[in-house]
């Protein structure tokens, strides 16, 4: 399934994988998965985390390695994000719930994920998604950005 991914997508997923793989050992454990999900405002139970891992854990060793992660991401992309998932994701970024993602809100979420971005990088991300040029990202722009991936 991962064969259908572009090199750019694989590089992005590699970056995402290393955000999850806190200790850099090449595997994502339930603990690491939980940490990242909680930093995104989710609160998965231990059982839910186990389920997520065993769903893609091809060699049944209890962790996710990069090839397994790629398969998971390829599968998720095929299911393309449901309206509901996109609304949830937007809420994670839109901290003050005003219907817009500001540069500060984007920086806050990325920092929680352990991603240290320069102001320039954050501004660049906003610029890429900001179609109407008001300096922030509304829900429409967010959906367009997520579906363009």
UniProtKB/Swiss-Prot annotation:
Residues 8-43, 44-79, 81-116, 117-149 form the EF-hand domain. Pfam families: EF-hand_7. The keyword Cell cycle does not apply. Ca(2+) 4 binds at residues 130, 132, 134, 136, 141. Ca(2+) 1 binds at residues 21, 23, 25, 27, 32. Disulfide bonds: none annotated. Ca(2+) 2 binds at residues 57, 59, 61, 63, 68. Ca(2+) 3 binds at residues 94, 96, 98, 105. PANTHER family: CALMODULIN, MYOSIN LIGHT CHAIN 1, 3. Belongs to the calmodulin family. This is Calmodulin. It comes from Solanum lycopersicum (Tomato). The gene is CALM1.
